[in-house]
């Protein structure tokens, strides 16, 4: 087997890798389009001269400008932090499907509220709208990865959850180029800066429409005791009959996992809270998941996403249009590399190796960019002077950092957090993981303007140092999860050393699979047997007169 081969825990029929599973993942990932667009458009929009003129920006002190910029950006993260936790009761009681619908609805209300802002009304509507939009995307960032991971076959689970990350990058790409387009084609006016705010309504509207046609997660239906509908949905998604041996295995694994959860943690709404506080194993995994998002945000990605014009100015680029163009190219690079990660890397190269390679390469690039700024002091040069050779090299290493970071730390923490928890604590665990992402996101975005003002080149050294530390964390604490069924994740955290756990669990799964199929063959199992059992079960379920 090559290092770039798909890892299957058992023989998987080709019907399982069908268009339906990709369509469901794509519709759910309009959530991440909302997030990506918001993270990309806001920093560039508030840098437009038309926005500054509308709100009398130039009359403010530099400190006040930095404070308002930070507030506009960080209120969104604050809302997202709380939205991630509000999503837990929605996902538990209403399901993944309707939870996503409510998240999109709240986001749409927030986006609509922002459209009422102008110079006379002030920034209050933008502040309020950003909080509501944050609540919506925070809830969506909790539910979407869970929904997709619960639908996905193990061998392509990383790829399918990666569609969520792809949606993020497509939304970001649109956000970057919308701002470049309005700056390049429209005269400074209210219309120029309000258009990027209005475009937020497109991905949320598509999600509101699309969610009406998707299927509920079978695993959530099993959890809620709606077994018949769960089996029906699972068969529809897999495109296999209920008596196929693959379906028998999967349903049996889900039943076994739920029975284990019922006898240990319990299946109620409050049971996961008790389990988290009383079970060190679950608490430890929550720590790992939250730390992955600390290292992700510690790479500097959100400082760049939200304040890209400031970042490029620190390297020596001048002019709003030039910064917007460079930011747009940054978005293109991220999107292209995300496709590579999605199609070839995440389920073939695996999670651990990607994280370590990305951190090592990205750290080197940031050290070089920071060293250039320290030595050359590009911000002190003539604003009309073109980039010199050192500046061009710094831009090259910035984009090379993007190539290292994007297929490693951008989406992989979301994939791992969606798959490494037991079914009954998965919603709560994902809420904690998503909440931690938005907490670190908030802290970075809130203080980035002040960091660039005070630290200058030191900002790049700071993020480069954190990327080095993340390598040590991943090597010693994070197991590989590719190709492992959700119901078998516990084993990964029981074997030591952690870097050998994946091979041991996979070998055990294949041994169990071979034994199961041998037992099935020796029992003389046929499809007609399964159909007869199903008919008997249906007959027994009919009420007697």
Curated annotation (Swiss-Prot):
Residues 520-545 are annotated as: Disordered. Interacts with creB. Residues 1-22, 88-97, 152-159, 215-285, 347-352, 406-457 are cytoplasmic. Gene3D superfamilies: MFS general substrate transporter like domains. InterPro entries: MFS_dom, MFS_sugar_transport-like, MFS_Sugar_Transporters, MFS_trans_sf, Sugar/inositol_transpt, Sugar_transporter_CS. GO terms for molecular function: carbohydrate:proton symporter activity. Its main location: membrane. Ubiquitinated. Deubiquitinated by creB, probably to control its activity or amount. It comes from the Eukaryota. Residues 44-66, 119-130, 181-193, 307-325, 374-384, 479-545 are extracellular. This is Probable quinate permease. Pfam families: Sugar_tr. Signal peptide: none annotated. Disulfide bonds: none annotated. It comes from Aspergillus terreus (strain NIH 2624 / FGSC A1156). Belongs to the major facilitator superfamily. Sugar transporter (TC 2.A.1.1) family. GO terms for cellular component: plasma membrane.
């Amino acid at each position: 087997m090559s290092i770039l081969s798909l890892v299957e825990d058992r023989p998987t029929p080709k019907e399982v890798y069908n268009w339906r599973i990709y369509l469901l993942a794509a519709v759910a990932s309009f959530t991440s389009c909302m997030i990506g667009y918001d993270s990309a458009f806001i920093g560039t929009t508030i840098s437009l001269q038309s926005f500054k003129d509308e709100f009398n920006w130039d009359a403010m002190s530099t400190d006040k400008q930095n404070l308002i910029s930070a507030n506009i950006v960080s209120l969104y993260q604050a809302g997202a932090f709380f939205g991630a936790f509000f999503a837990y009761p929605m996902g538990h009681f209403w399901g993944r499907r309707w939870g996503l619908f409510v998240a999109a609805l709240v986001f749409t209300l927030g986006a609509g509220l922002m459209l009422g802002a102008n110079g006379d009304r002030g920034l209050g509507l933008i502040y309020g709208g950003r909080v509501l939009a944050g609540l919506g995307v925070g809830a969506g960032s909790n539910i979407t990865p869970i929904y997709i991971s619960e639908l996905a076959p193990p061998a392509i689970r990383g790829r399918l959850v990666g569609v969520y990350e792809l949606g993020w990058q497509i939304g970001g790409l649109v956000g970057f180029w919308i701002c470049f387009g309005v700056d390049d084609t429209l005269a400074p006016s209210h219309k120029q800066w309000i258009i990027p705010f209005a475009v937020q309504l497109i991905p949320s509207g598509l999600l509101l429409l699309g969610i009406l046609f998707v299927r509920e997660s079978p695993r959530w239906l099993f959890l809620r005791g709606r077994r018949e509908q769960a089996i029906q949905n699972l068969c529809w998604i897999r495109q296999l009959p209920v008596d196929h041996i693959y379906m028998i295995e999967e349903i049996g694994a889900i039943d076994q996992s739920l029975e284990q959860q019922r006898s240990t943690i319990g299946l109620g709404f409050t049971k996961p809270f008790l389990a988290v506080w009383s079970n060190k194993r679950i608490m430890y995994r929550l720590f790992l998941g939250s730390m992955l998002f600390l290292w992700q945000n510690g790479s500097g990605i959100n400082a760049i996403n939200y304040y890209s014009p400031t970042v490029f100015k620190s390297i020596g680029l001048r002019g709003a249009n030039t910064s917007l163009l460079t930011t747009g190219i940054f978005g293109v690079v991220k999107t292209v590399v995300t496709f590579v990660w999605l199609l070839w890397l995440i389920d073939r190269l695996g999670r651990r190796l990607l994280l370590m390679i990305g951190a090592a390469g990205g750290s080197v690039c940031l050290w070089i960019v920071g060293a250039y700024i320290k030595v050359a002091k590009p911000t002190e040069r003539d604003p009309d002077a073109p980039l010199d050779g050192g500046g061009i090299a710094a831009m090259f290493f910035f984009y090379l950092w993007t190539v290292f970071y994007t297929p490693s730390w951008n989406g992989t923490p979301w994939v791992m957090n969606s798959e490494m928890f037991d079914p009954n604590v998965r919603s709560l665990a994902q809420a904690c993981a998503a909440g931690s992402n938005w907490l670190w996101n908030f802290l970075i975005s809130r203080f980035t303007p002040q960091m660039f003002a005070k630290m200058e080149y030191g900002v790049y050294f700071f993020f480069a140092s954190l990327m080095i530390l993340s390598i040590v964390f991943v090597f010693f604490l994070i197991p590989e999860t590719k190709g492992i069924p959700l119901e078998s994740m516990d084993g990964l955290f029981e074997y030591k050393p952690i870097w050998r756990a994946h091979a041991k669990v996979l070998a055990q799964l294949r041994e169990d699979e071979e034994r199961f199929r041998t037992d099935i063959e020796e029992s003389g199992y046929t499809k007609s047997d399964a159909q007869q059992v199903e008919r008997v079960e249906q007959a027994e379920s009919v009420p007697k007169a």
